[in-house]
Regions:
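Bacterial N-terminal signal peptides
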Residues: 1-8
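Intrinsically disordered, low-complexity linkers and terminal tails enriched in Pro/Gly
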Residues: 8-9, 164
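Exposed acidic/polar residues on beta-strands and adjacent loops within beta-sheet cores, strongest
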Residues: 15-164
Length: 164
């Protein structure tokens, strides 16, 4: 237990037990950004694996869905990272994962991810799409390079080395 005294207020914080962790320790960087919407009949983001969790309800076809994207890096045992993209649906009961995909372009590089940043930090974006930058090294001694992840209004994903 940790105690902290702030301007006459005593605050006590207790560490949560390891088994109650909300975010796995291997997730080293994450950002939630962008916006998507569909009529409920559209497929989830391109390249989604067959085992992706889906929030589409076949009995309620045509139900409008919308949400945002989450881009995150997961450290691997060899200290490199895999980068994943999630499509998060805003539902009546709160956020729900619509799909999760591994961005193979990053996995092929076996990168050391040093940061992930959204295009801006202004909060909710109402134009469909996503733009974020993943900073990575392919050699641990090198300087990081920026790689952009772009999702257009049609849901097509582009991953490419950033240009200055």
């Amino acid at each position: 237990m940790t105690s902290l005294l702030l301007a006459g207020w005593s605050v006590t914080a207790e560490a949560a037990p390891a088994q109650d962790a909300l975010l796995p320790a291997a997730v080293i960087f994450a950002t939630s950004t962008g916006y998507w919407e569909d009529d409920g009949n559209a497929p989830n983001v391109e390249r989604a694996p067959t085992g992706a969790e889906s929030v589409a309800n076949p009995e309620e076809e045509g139900t409008q869905r919308h949400g945002y994207y989450k881009l995150f890096a997961v450290r691997q045992p060899d200290r490199t990272s895999k980068v994943y993209l999630q499509q998060i649906a805003q539902t009546e009961t709160g956020p729900a994962i619509a799909s999760t995909i591994e961005l193979q372009e990053f996995s092929d590089l076996k990168p050391y991810v040093t940061d992930i940043r959204p295009e801006n930090s202004n909060g909710i974006i109402k134009q469909p799409g996503l733009f974020a930058t993943v900073y990575l090294k392919t050699d641990p001694a090198a300087e990081p390079d920026g790689w952009t992840v772009l999702i257009d209004e049609f849901g097509d994903i582009t991953v490419e080395k950033a240009t200055n």
